[in-house]
Structures are given as structure tokens and as C-alpha cells.
Amino acid sequence: MYPLARRILFALDAEKAHHFTLDALYTVYKLGLIPVTDNRTKPVKLMGMDLPNPVGLAAGLDKNGEYIDALGALGFGFIEIGTVTPNPQPGNPQPRLFRVPEHQGIINRMGFNNHGIDTMIRNIEKSKFSGVLGINIGKNAVTPIENAADDYLICLEKAYAHASYITVNISSPNTKNLRALQGGDELSALLEALKNKQAQLASVHGKYVPLAVKIAPDLDEAQIEDIAHVVKSVEMDGIIATNTTIDKSSLGSHPLAGEQGGLSGLPVHEKSNRVLKLLADHIDGKLPIIGVGGIMEGEDSADKIRLGATAVQVYSGLIYKGPALVKECLKALAR
């Protein structure tokens, strides 16, 4: 059924199709037409949390937490929403989302378009979802990079009571200078500030909410080693590898190869796996890794687990394969 739907959706503007698909999914969910499936197919522990299975939804699909219940019916072991910022912002000008079907890729330069953390919290409070929910946090575009920690701290404080875990997004290529936060001193200062705030919030709320950090695929081994050292030193709870790539050389002479933004899907597969493997080598099992990037079929998820990931996340693969990808991944991981 999805291949037919995809042909129709791919005839639409990519961003319009994105919203149409989510609205349609929500309608089908409200009508009770999504079959109830047991997602407890391969329980795993991640950052102290019990997941029913290790296949999660990556951040970016549901930026405001408007579709949590419907997405929760698709069999995921966990769902991550966002990226969310302290204040609402429109993101970058349209068009800002492009499909590259010849390469099973997607280019986006969305720019953290979202309705703000307060709206997201209200959406979560209305949700009936009782599974593992991650909230991915970022900084507003107007916030100077030297004040970025302030934005992350605001989001952390507001999200804390409503999240199963929180992801610190410092790797989107679509917010100016954001990736500079992945470097040594800047990374240490930011993560230490967040870990200190986490300790305070754990005391206030009487519960511990794990903190993960999401990194880019465009890192050399020295940078990966540096990041591994920092996350171990500050005792982060997890790390997500990886975000989208700014390297579009894999697209060759394709007309969209010159578009600004991050490239995801099949073209990021090898880069993401390279970072995952190097990261796993340098982490030494001190904290779990969530593998994301280029999972287009079930066996791709199994590859990431073999390379050192504890769990995986999908997004672009869903656009090309539909919800069947989740079952395909679970089947591959069960072998």
C-alpha cells in the first residue's frame, strides 16, 4: 500500500507531503484503523531505561510533539520529538526540503522551525503515549553562539519533567555556527553546565532523566576521539551518531547536489557507520550509542548494532519505505 501512497506523495512538494502524511496518519489513528501491535519484540536497556525494542524514531519528523500518539502506534521502541528551541521560530525560507530519489536521499535546511518548548510541553500533556519519549533540544537562531548554553538550559529545565530522556543537538548544519559546539572546550563547558542542571533537576523532581548528545558524521578521527573523551569525562548518559552530512559528493552531478543543507538517507550510510565504529572504539563501552543515519532496510539496523550501537533510530528510510521499515528492522535484529 505504501509504494502507491509514496508515488502520490512524491508528486507533492516535499514539505507539503510531510505535513499531509502526518495529518493522514493522525486521522487514521483517531479512527482506530492502525492495527495494535505488540512492540515488545526485543527488550533492551538504554541509558537506564527499559525499551520494548531497540528501533526508535529519530528527531525531526514530529518537531512539536503533535503526533506522538499516532507515531507511537507504529511499533517503535522509543520516539524522539523536536528539535525544539526556547522560543518559536519559523526556520529558514522555503523551499528547504528536497528529495533525491535517485540516491534515496533527502536534503533539508529546515533551521529548527518549531513552535517553542512551551507549546511542545502542552502537546505532550495532551498525549496518551506511555512509552519512552525523548525530547531533542536546540538553540534559537537569534541566540549568539557564545550564549547557546542559556537556550539549552531553558529547554532542559522545561522539558525535564516530561521526557524519558533529553538529547542535546549540537550537530545540525542548518543553524549558524552550531557545529562549533562539538569542539573541545566549547563542548566541555556546555555539557558540564547541562549535567550540573540535570543534577539539580533530578533532586527537584525526584527522578533522573538521562542526557544524550547528538553528533555529526563530518568528523575526523581526532575530533571523534576528543568528543569521546569529553562525554566520558562529564559522564553523559548516551550519544547519538549521527546527524545529517554537509558532504554531497555522493550525489555527483545531480541538480540538487548544490543545495545547502544536511543530506540524509542512503548517502549518509557509510559516513555514519564510520563515525559509529570509531566512536564505539573510543567510548570503550562507558556509555551507550544510538546509531542513526542511512537505515534504509532491516539489515542496516543490524549493521549498526554490530558496529557498537545499543539502539537505532530511523527517519529518512521511513520516507522511502513507509512504516514497514520498523518491522523489517525488528525482524533483522531478531535473527
UniProtKB/Swiss-Prot annotation:
Q: Which residues, if any, are the signal sequence?
A: none
Complexes and interactors: Monomer.
So where's the catalytic machinery, residue-wise? Answer: S172 (nucleophile)
Cite the PROSITE patterns for this sequence: DHODEHASE_1
- What one GO molecular function would you report for this record? dihydroorotate dehydrogenase (quinone) activity
Q: Which NCBIfam families match?
A: PRK05286.1-1, PRK05286.1-2, PRK05286.1-4, PRK05286.2-5, pyrD_sub2
Describe the task this protein carries out. Catalyzes the conversion of dihydroorotate to orotate with quinone as electron acceptor.
Which species is this UniProt entry from? Neisseria meningitidis serogroup B (strain ATCC BAA-335 / MC58)
Q: Which Pfam families match?
A: DHO_dh (PF01180)
Localization per Swiss-Prot or TrEMBL: Cell membrane
> Can you tell me which family this protein belongs to?
Belongs to the dihydroorotate dehydrogenase family. Type 2 subfamily.
The name this protein carries in UniProt is Dihydroorotate dehydrogenase (quinone)
Major place of residence: membrane
Q: Which gene encodes it?
A: pyrD
Q: Which Gene3D superfamilies match?
A: Aldolase class I
> In what pathway does it function?
Pyrimidine metabolism; UMP biosynthesis via de novo pathway; orotate from (S)-dihydroorotate (quinone route): step 1/1
Q: Keyword annotations for this protein?
A: Cell membrane, Flavoprotein, FMN, Membrane, Oxidoreductase, Pyrimidine biosynthesis
Class of the enzyme per the UniProt entry, highest EC level: oxidoreductase
Binding-site residues, FMN: A59, G60, L61, D62, K63, T83, N136, N169, K214, T242, G265, G294, Y315, S316
Cofactor dependence is on:
FMN
Topologically, how does it sit relative to the membrane?
A: Peripheral membrane protein
Does the record carry Membrane as a key word? yes
> Where on this chain does substrate bind?
K63, N108, R109, M110, G111, F112, N169, N174, N243, T244
Q: Which reaction does it catalyse?
A: (S)-dihydroorotate + a quinone = orotate + a quinol
Quote the cofactor binding remark: Binds 1 FMN per subunit.
The Gene Ontology biological process annotation of the record reads:
'de novo' pyrimidine nucleobase biosynthetic process; 'de novo' UMP biosynthetic process; pyrimidine ribonucleotide biosynthetic process
E.C. designation(s): 1.3.5.2
Q: Name one GO cellular component term.
A: cytoplasm
